[in-house]
Amino acid sequence: MDSTVPSALELPQRLALNPRESPRSPEEEEPHLLSSLAAVQTLASVIRPCYGPHGRQKFLVTMKGETVCTGCATAILRALELEHPAAWLLREAGQTQAENSGDGTAFVVLLTEALLEQAEQLLKAGLPRPQLREAYATATAEVLATLPSLAIQSLGPLEDPSWALHSVMNTHTLSPMDHLTKLVAHACWAIKELDGSFKPERVGVCALPGGTLEDSCLLPGLAISGKLCGQMATVLSGARVALFACPFGPAHPNAPATARLSSPADLAQFSKGSDQLLEKQVGQLAAAGINVAVVLGEVDEETLTLADKYGIVVIQARSWMEIIYLSEVLDTPLLPRLLPPQRPGKCQRVYRQELGDGLAVVFEWECTGTPALTVVLRGATTQGLRSAEQAVYHGIDAYFQLCQDPRLIPGAGATEMALAKMLSDKGSRLEGPSGPAFLAFAWALKYLPKTLAENAGLAVSDVMAEMSGVHQGGNLLMGVGTEGIINVAQEGVWDTLIVKAQGFRAVAEVVLQLVTVDEIVVAKKSPTHQEIWNPDSKKTKKHPPPVETKKILGLNN
């Protein structure tokens, strides 16, 4: 080994102080060796208070000016305006984790931050970047190899999945989820295929304002919170559906146009031509066998009268999400004009279902391969409905993961503490750079249950000391609860193995990439010929650079 590289015995001594336990004053603060660390720390500081079942909510103001109260890390990451490339990379990893596994976004962000902080200390201790990267990769492989041995529970093929979904759904809402968990478990169980496969798209979710969460129920088919327009409200058999992303009425072209009318006769002719065009369009829909039209736009009264004349049920969708989901389920395109689709959607019947003071429109099938059940959510506030809807989707995703791999591991930070103990034991015996890297990885893993305890309002040092002692004694089922440490088996707090493993892979990919980055170089465009020679331009430069320059990006707080 090179003489400039500290020995394996020197590194642990130089890493004795955890960076979180040795605060510095601003004057004493050293520059980061990892250029991406500050950006990752800032991003994690936004997500950290939302981690776990006791995480706090945030008022999120979107680009459209809409205010949303949420504790969902995925929604927060999606709404943030980021400039730093490392923050972009971490957000992409978190969103990929959510899309592929349905959960674990905050886990990815926080563990990445903790590992990079430990990597910074290893670099300051003199460990070269290539050896650090190799040691971290070895530790990740050790974690992934050990993880299946912690799976002490498994969902049976004929078992009610409520107990397995309970902790997943309760993590993402402030309301009690017992009733909703049973509904989701029933829906998932009912549409599970005989071969054990499960299609998440066969479970619909419909949110109706009004009532309470206990009023939520299951409806057969696919239900949406659309508005029925006109006199036609039901198709009892042979429904053929067309979807339109436009007003149900006269077209409104984007380009402005002015009709030049010189006499009352011209005005009458213009109005007559418009009416004839609308009647022709509605007649074409009826001739193609369309008896249900779902529109995302305004509904014209005269056009609605024509639809009643031809026996067409007109439904006004309330959101893009509903009509896009209908397009996917019915396998019919979303049309920009009132034209018959080449492939209309088909279902057995369409009818309205009254639920207290709410109204749902139900599309029902009798054949296989289509949505069988819809979870209809009730709630007094929009924010409460959004939170419940998010919890339902997490439950559906969790059941989908369990159908692929039914194994479950302890939750509430118990798995992270067990893995940290394993890495600490091995790291203390290993020689070379792998030993300190294993110890650093163990420190990073302990950061997750520490965050759970902090968000629960507990005495963090006492909880972590008690958990460490219990895990050292061999009890790997102890995690962080509301009032202290809990036995996760008795409390029923479980995580799916496949989601946790995917989360570790995502974290490893980001960390192994960022530890090799020393600086961020941004190409700067050279000024154009007009900008150079325009004397009135404020950006005029007498001597423009002949080549592109580079700019080192910092973090925009």
Swiss-Prot record:
InterPro entries: Chaperone_TCP-1, Cpn60/GroEL/TCP-1, GroEL-like_apical_dom_sf, GROEL-like_equatorial_sf, TCP-1-like_intermed_sf
Organism field: Homo sapiens (Human)
Keyword match Nucleotide-binding: yes
Gene Ontology biological process terms in this record: protein folding
Note from the entry: Presence of two highly similar CCT8L genes (CCT8L1P and CCT8L2) in the genomes of human and chimp and of a single copy in other mammal genomes, including rhesus monkey, suggests that the duplication of this gene occurred in the ape lineage (Hominoidea) after its divergence from the old-world monkeys (Cercopithecidae).
UniProt-recorded name of the protein: T-complex protein 1 subunit theta-like 2
Keyword tags: ATP-binding, Chaperone, Cytoplasm, Nucleotide-binding
Protein origin, superkingdom: Eukaryota
Database matches in Gene3D superfamilies: GroEL (3.50.7.10), GroEL-like equatorial domain (1.10.560.10), TCP-1-like chaperonin intermediate domain (3.30.260.10)
Subcellular location(s) per record: Cytoplasm
GO cellular component: chaperonin-containing T-complex
Molecular function GO labels: ATP binding; ATP-dependent protein folding chaperone; calcium-activated potassium channel activity; monoatomic anion channel activity; unfolded protein binding
Protein family: Belongs to the TCP-1 chaperonin family.
Annotated function: Possible molecular chaperone; assists the folding of proteins upon ATP hydrolysis.
One Pfam assignment: Cpn60_TCP1
Bridged cysteine pairs (disulfide): none
